């Protein structure tokens, strides 16, 4: 990377650094990821995330290493309903594999680099297990499920600037040890800790479509369809399938976003988190929500949504007739038939510019990521129209747009028609984002 590109990357990443600081991320590291040649670089990137003020919980699995030990000991893995059946001998090998990985991960995270502080990595009894029991006549023996998560203990460690490390073996209240599916642990930890993100890795750059191209965004129902395809191909144990199941569950429980990245590509974690378009697959939003182009039937709901903001002077007043004429310009988020957010895209073809206008989010959802979802969709629509610059006029949300890569501009920077009709009495701030800039 040339020095100018490096400077540009740092500048573009700044909004994301600010956005992620203080948030809690749960990172899933399965056995394949840990065994990959690129794992040492992933560890370095995790250390970087911690240095940027992100609270990190690492949940690791050991399926690859466990199966390797079983094979070396001439023991055939046994599964029932995609869950490993763990007898006493198998549990000893599970503990051996998990214990070694726990030590290796902790050692690599704790490795001190020149002029950098020593990281505090904590691995303790943060979870308690209980036996799965018998299902359809099959005794799972020492395979377990979560009984309790020590949420306050984990929070305290995060507040003390520690990285929390959790493995797939946990004790029970009776003193026995149980083998847990690590994706179940990661799922429940993310939900109970109210994490901002769940991050996983696989041998592909996210979920691929039928042409082998990475899918940038998925809704839960779309993710469920892809998960079913993995199951039908008898690939439930793949990294992709296990991540999809976890991501669907956490998204429906309130975790804002989940990301699946390649463990083979160096820097994929940083590219996903600190560039505009990312590199892997992101799953977000609840299944009850739909983002779509507005229709005439949506006009009453749109008026109801934007009217309070017009009364406050935040939005310019729009008549019903004007909405009817421009309805196809509006992108809306529909939640169970209720419009909870909207934004319009006004295109100026000659200048290859477009305006994101009439941005409104229902008060009950303003603390969520709906604004980000709208912005991403408007960007996508603009790019599909070969728009090079996206601009906004705002009186109240300058910082919000600046945090997402927009830069202050002047009236002279607007398209001619918009410039000629600029309301100097309203004194709206003008912000512009270049859609043609590289994302790294």
Curated annotation (Swiss-Prot):
Keywords: Acyltransferase, Amino-acid biosynthesis, Arginine biosynthesis, Cytoplasm, Transferase. It holds the Pfam family AA_kinase. One of its GO terms (cellular component) is cytoplasm. Pathway: Amino-acid biosynthesis; L-arginine biosynthesis; N(2)-acetyl-L-ornithine from L-glutamate: step 1/4. One of its GO terms (biological process) is L-arginine biosynthetic process. Gene3D superfamilies: 3.40.630.30, Acetylglutamate kinase-like (3.40.1160.10). It comes from the Bacteria. The keyword Lipid metabolism does not apply. PROSITE patterns: GNAT. Residues 289-429 form the N-acetyltransferase domain. It is found in: Cytoplasm. It catalyses: L-glutamate + acetyl-CoA = N-acetyl-L-glutamate + CoA + H(+). The keyword tRNA-binding does not apply. SUPFAM superfamilies: Acyl-CoA N-acyltransferases (Nat), Carbamate kinase-like. Disulfide bonds: none annotated. InterPro entries: AceGlu_kinase-like_sf, Acyl_CoA_acyltransferase, Asp/Glu/Uridylate_kinase, GNAT_dom, NAGS_kin, NH2A_AcTrfase. GO terms for molecular function: L-glutamate N-acetyltransferase activity. Its EC number is 2.3.1.1. Belongs to the acetyltransferase family. ArgA subfamily. In bacteria which possess the bifunctional enzyme ornithine acetyltransferase/N-acetylglutamate synthase (ArgJ), ArgA fulfills an anaplerotic role. This is Amino-acid acetyltransferase. It comes from Actinobacillus succinogenes (strain ATCC 55618 / DSM 22257 / CCUG 43843 / 130Z).
């Amino acid at each position: 990377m040339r020095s100018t590109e490096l400077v540009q990357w740092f500048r573009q990443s700044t909004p994301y650094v600010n956005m992620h600081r203080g948030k809690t991320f749960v990172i899933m590291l399965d056995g394949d990821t840990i065994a990959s040649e690129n794992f040492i670089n992933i560890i370095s990137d995790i250390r970087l995330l911690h240095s940027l003020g992100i609270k990190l919980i690492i949940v690791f699995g050991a399926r690859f290493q466990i199966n390797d030990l079983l094979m070396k000991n001439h023991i055939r893995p046994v599964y029932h309903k995609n869950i490993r059946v763990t007898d006493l001998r198998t549990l000893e090998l599970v503990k051996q594999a998990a214990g070694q990985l726990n030590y290796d991960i902790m050692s690599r995270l704790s490795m001190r680099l020149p002029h950098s502080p020593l990281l505090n990595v904590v691995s303790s009894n943060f979870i308690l297990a209980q036996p799965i029991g018998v299902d359809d006549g099959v005794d799972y023996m020492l395979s377990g499920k979560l009984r309790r998560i020590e949420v306050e203990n984990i929070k305290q460690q995060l507040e003390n600037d520690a990285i929390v490390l959790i493995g797939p073996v946990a004790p029970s209240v009776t003193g026995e040890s149980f083998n847990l599916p690590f994706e179940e642990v990661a799922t429940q930890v993310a939900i109970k800790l109210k994490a901002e993100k769940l991050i996983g890795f696989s041998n592909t750059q996210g979920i691929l479509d039928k042409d082998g191209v990475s899918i940038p965004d998925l809704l839960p129902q779309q993710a469920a369809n892809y998960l079913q395809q993995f199951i039908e191909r008898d690939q439930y144990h793949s990294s992709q399938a296990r991540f999809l199941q976890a991501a669907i569950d956490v998204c429906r429980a309130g975790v804002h976003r989940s990301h699946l990245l390649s463990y083979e590509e160096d820097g994929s974690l940083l590219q996903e988190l600190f560039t505009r378009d990312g590199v892997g697959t992101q799953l977000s939003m609840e299944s009850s929500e739909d983002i779509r182009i507005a229709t005439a039937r949506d006009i009453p709901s749109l008026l109801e949504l934007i009217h309070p903001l017009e009364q406050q002077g935040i939005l310019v007043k729009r008549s019903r007739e004007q909405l009817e004429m421009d309805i196809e310009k509006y992108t809306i988020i529909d939640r169970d038939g209720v419009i909870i957010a909207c934004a319009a895209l006004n295109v100026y073809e000659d200048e290859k510019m477009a305006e994101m206008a009439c941005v409104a989010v229902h008060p009950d959802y303003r603390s969520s990521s709906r604004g980000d979802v709208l912005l991403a969709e408007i960007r996508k629509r603009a790019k599909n129209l070969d728009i090079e610059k996206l601009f906004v006029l705002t009186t109240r949300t300058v910082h919000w747009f600046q945090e997402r890569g927009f830069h202050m501009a002047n009236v002279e920077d607007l398209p001619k028609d918009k410039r000629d009709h600029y309301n100097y009495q309203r004194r709206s701030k003008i912000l512009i984002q270049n859609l043609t800039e590289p994302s790294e």
